Amino acid sequence: MNTALKASQSIEINATCESVWDTMTNPEKIKVYLYGTETNTDWKVGSPIVFQGNYEGHVYNDKGNVLEVKENELLKYNYWSSMSGTEGKIENYFIVTYRIEQLSEGKVKFTWQQEGFPTEEKRKHTESGLCTMIEQIKEIAER
């Protein structure tokens, strides 16, 4: 895994840390901003994660594990994408980190970071879609 290649995006959200946390861990809300993805996990350290769905006609079944949890602050997990064209070996897993930082009452900074890209081209492709996804996360959390 090449941890040097990272994609990251931050946004200020007018919501509580709890609301943003719920947006990031609630399967029904994840489905809204993650292209209809079904998410199955209990978000406990060491637990498996399964992301599955259909993206532009391609069925996917991605798998990973929860690595770190600090409720309402930090969530870190790894996953392998069945659409990556690689074997499901740990060295082909991505690492995703969500950080929620309270800026003031009712305002937080949310950061999404993904690392482990095999090429700069794949990193840029992911980064190009992050802005839209982050805006959707903000919209959901502010409801």
PLM regions: where:
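A conserved amphipathic terminal alpha-helix motif
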Residues: 2, 109, 115-143
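Generic structural detector for well-ordered beta-strands
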Residues: 10-14, 50, 65, 99
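Hydrophobic pocket/interface hotspot
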Residues: 20-21, 30, 49-51, 66, ...
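Hydrophobic ligand-binding cavity/cleft-lining segments
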Residues: 1-38, 45
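Hydrophobic-ligand binding "helix-grip"
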Residues: 39-42, 59-105, 115
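Short polar/acidic secondary-structure junctions
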Residues: 54-56
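Intrinsic-disorder/low-complexity, polar/charged segments enriched in Ser/Thr/Lys/Arg/Asp/Glu/Gln
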Residues: 4-10, 48, 61, 74, ...
